[in-house]
Amino acid sequence: MFMADAYFADTVWYVGQIIFIVAICLLVIIVVVAFLATFKLCIQLCGMCNTLGLSPSIYVFNRGRQFYEFYNDVKPPVLDVDDV
């Protein structure tokens, strides 16, 4: 009878260890997934800042340069005027 109780206690201890290991693994997985989700959100926010801030600036710069080049192409040349 005593031996059966000892085996039962060992079995409960092993099952407890397995449950503990599984719980730790699940906790680690949850923490890693939360970290990766946070990292992904930061990357998306940086992309949004790029879209809202940098891209319009580049567009305005390029359009301004195009207008400047167009103006220089269409303006009439300076006429040579004799000194009066």
Swiss-Prot record:
Q: Which GO terms describe its cellular component?
A: host cell Golgi membrane; membrane
Lipid bilayer topology: Single-pass type III membrane protein
**Chain segments annotated as transmembrane:** 19-39
Which InterPro entries does this one have? Answer: E_protein_bCoV (IPR043506), E_protein_CoV (IPR003873)
Enumerate the UniProt keywords alphabetically: Apoptosis, Host Golgi apparatus, Host membrane, Membrane, Transmembrane, Transmembrane helix
Cysteine-cysteine disulfides: none
Q: This protein's superkingdom?
A: Viruses
Q: In UniProt terms, what function does this protein have?
A: Plays a central role in virus morphogenesis and assembly. Acts as a viroporin and self-assembles in host membranes forming pentameric protein-lipid pores that allow ion transport. Also plays a role in the induction of apoptosis.
Q: Which HAMAP family match?
A: BETA_CORONA_E
How does the record describe its quaternary structure? Homopentamer. Interacts with membrane protein M in the budding compartment of the host cell, which is located between endoplasmic reticulum and the Golgi complex. Interacts with Nucleoprotein.
What protein name applies here?
Envelope small membrane protein
